[in-house]
Amino acid sequence: KLEPSGWASRKLTTEEATNGIVGHLCSPDQKQSFCITVVKGRFADILAASDLVIGLAGTGNEQAVGLGKPVVTFPGRGPQFSEKFVKIQKRLLGDSISLMTREPSVIAGEILKILTDASIKEKMGAIGLERMGEPGGARKIALQIKEYFDRSKRAI
């Protein structure tokens, strides 16, 4: 499927393969040539370095939004990331994510719009941070549960 559009894969170095890089997809455009690096097992590192996330995973999208990253998403083909699930996630995350149809040209247009308009990117990031809250929520909940049980033991 890469051939008709002109995209090409670039050969990996041994060091890249050792560091979790699976491959590179490079554009045919000579004026604005760029490559997409495909990585496995380095989610946190890639997320931290990303300007935008194309996300098709519930928890992954929520983690990206929680770090202030804009997310472009669309229903997947499998049973887990269905249209129903994506709509529920959109209600949770609001305008920190762009919910698109499975139309490549529409998705690409949305990605370019976000990446080329700093105000949209910043707004989506701010909404994500607000929706997901500050880091440390799970720790705070665990401490509250521990305090509850500690009080219960003293009352006995």
Range-by-range predicted roles:
Residues 1-156:
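Nucleotide-activated sugar donor-binding and catalytic core shared by glycosyltransferases
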